[in-house]
From Swiss-Prot:
EC numbers for this chain: 3.6.5.3
Family: Belongs to the TRAFAC class translation factor GTPase superfamily. Classic translation factor GTPase family. EF-Tu/EF-1A subfamily.
The name this protein goes by in its record: Elongation factor Tu, chloroplastic
Top-rank taxon, per record: Eukaryota
GO cellular component: chloroplast; mitochondrion
Gene assigned in the entry: tufA
């Protein structure tokens, strides 16, 4: 069956749900798709359709299982919801780099929890530009003053991590009650249910308060590979978000990082099971590659315009080391420390060869007097980093440092140190 063409009629925005486990991220995602489906702007997706990842689909290109698409009157959205917690933080570092904005879901009944803070911090680190807050489970809160207290707590967290809280819109509702009303009557009209109306109100707020991003269309094409599928009779497909530039079918690209660079031709491009002649920055797409085996390409590589980015292992980075309160280490570390470096969609072990202080949290501590200086939680430092595997990196790129399931630091590449 021939695939329909994707028609670009509205601006495309990538959005995601973030927040503490069990505060209702996936329920809210389901409620949004079903509410917009009632107005013809989406295919309704029930909770279990979002929460269970369909395995590779032999018939077509499946973009990462947690992506759903929907439309409001003004925009086309791709929505990412990553339910599992351990993967969530990992996906936030790789996936949040793809968000143009986020809906922070906080249970009005429970208030902010440790992961609420962690996700706000991560959103800031990876450059999510705007947040709208949804206080969920409002039906379980009898006293409106309690919701106001939760709102104040959330604003404090947003302020602490550099989101101007007085500009952030905070709405309340019940994703579950909205979803139940929509399951009972999929053709519900605005005005029929206060809970469904609160979902419409949320999306109107997202339309207005999460700015349409300025895409880097004039830069050379680059896509970080998120997933790879092999489609019988068609070849190998790499999926991911176009970080910058544009790409047309039949153009030549390079596959860079983790192993030797390979050159190939693009034979097809698809988005949400529709074909494209050209993909542009911001799209979540699948790219069919000529003559590439599934074993030749993996998550963490990049597909780019030939000659525009190179793989490297040695660079200098500027890093903020998280405190224990921010979810980081309790103790400091020395030269020779070997954590994981998360860059785009990949994580690679690296060694900290050297460092110099930019700003210390407690400069009077013995750390500087010691013959073997130590990096302490809360410090800002410049680091010289050696990765064990070459990956596509460039000046100005952000990365996260993780160890044993926790984020240790957040940084930016200052300089590539080898040819």
């Amino acid at each position: 069956m021939a695939r329909a063409k994707f028609e670009r009629k509205k601006p495309h925005v990538n959005i995601g749900t973030i927040g503490h486990v069990d505060h209702g991220k996936t329920t809210l995602t389901a409620a949004i798709t079903m509410a917009l489906a009632a107005r013809g702007g989406a295919t309704g997706r029930k909770y279990d359709e979002i929460d269970s990842a369909p395995e590779e689909k032999a018939r077509g290109i499946t973009i990462n299982a947690a992506h759903v698409e929907y439309e409001t009157e003004n925009r086309h959205y791709a929505h990412v919801d990553c339910p599992g917690h351990a993967d969530y933080v990992k996906n936030m570092i790789t996936g949040a780099a793809q968000m143009d904005g986020a809906i922070l879901v906080v249970s009005g009944a429970d208030g902010p929890m440790p992961q609420t803070t962690e996700h706000v911090l991560l959103a800031k680190q990876v450059g999510v530009p705007a947040i709208v807050v949804f206080l969920n489970k409002a039906d379980q809160v009898d006293d409106p003053e309690l919701l106001e207290l939760v709102e104040l707590e959330v604003r404090d967290i947003l302020d602490k991590y550099g989101f101007a809280s007085d500009e952030v819109q905070i709405l309340s509702g019940s994703a579950l009650l909205a979803l139940e009303a929509l399951v009972e009557n999929p053709n519900i009209k605005p005005g029929d249910s206060e809970w469904v109306d609160k979902i419409y109100n949320l999306m109107a707020t997202v339309d207005e308060h999460i700015p349409t991003p300025k895409r880097e269309m004039d830069k050379p094409f680059l896509l970080a590979v998120e997933d790879v599928f092999s489609i019988t009779g068609r070849g190998t497909v790499a999926t991911g978000r176009v970080e910058r530039g544009t790409l047309k079918v039949n153009e030549t690209v390079e596959i860079i990082g983790l192993r030797d660079t390979k050159t190939t031709t693009v034979t097809a491009i698809e988005m949400f099971q529709k074909t494209l002649d050209e993909t542009i920055a911001g799209d979540n797409v699948g790219i069919l590659l000529r003559g590439v085996q599934k074993k030749d390409i993996e998550r963490g590589m990049v597909i780019a315009k030939p000659g525009t980015i190179l793989p490297h292992t040695l660079f200098e980075g500027q890093v903020y080391v998280l405190t224990a309160e921010e979810g980081g280490r309790k103790s400091g570390f020395f030269k020779g420390y070997q954590p994981q470096f998360y860059v785009r969609t990949t994580d690679v072990t690296g060694k900290i060869l050297d460092f110099s202080y930019i700003k210390q949290r407690n400069p009077s501590e013995l750390s500087t007097m010691h013959s073997n200086p130590m990096v302490c939680p809360g410090d800002y430092v410049n680091m010289k980093i050696q990765l064990i595997t070459p990956i596509a990196i460039e000046k100005g790129m952000r990365f996260a440092i993780r160890e044993g399931g926790r984020t240790v630091g957040a940084g930016m590449v200052l300089e590539i140190l080898e040819s």
